[in-house]
Amino acid sequence: MQSFPHRRPYEITSDKRLLSCPSPYSFGSFLSEWIETLKKLEATDATTIVPGHGPVEHDKEYIKLVRSLLDSTTSQVQQAVQAGLSLDDTRKKVDLESFRKQFAGDSPTLNADFQEGVVDPAVKRAYPEAKEGKLHDED
């Protein structure tokens, strides 16, 4: 992130892994680090956020929504791991339906995109961290 402290507070973020509209793609992401980055962004006094992809944001509602999605994903994956579920069973158990509606609405294309670009890779990335307590740099 780059801050410009003079005049009006801005934050310029990098690529779509931080913010992307309508769905935040999670391929190759470290969800715990992503959550921490979003928390830092939320804590700034920025009134304008310029992501590398997606529209300019003039409030932090989308950031909060993405963080909530990631928090829910990691929490559900952690619970599944604690219950001894495999990755395949965890994929079936994680329920992000309320987020699907917020990000994809009724669009079949956006719903498929949400499943394939957000849910599936996010669960895959969160599982080894929940199971082993460390990040994995492979997809």
Where are these regions (language model features)?
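Metallo-beta-lactamase
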Residues: 1-76
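Accessory terminal helices/loops
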Residues: 43-45, 56-139
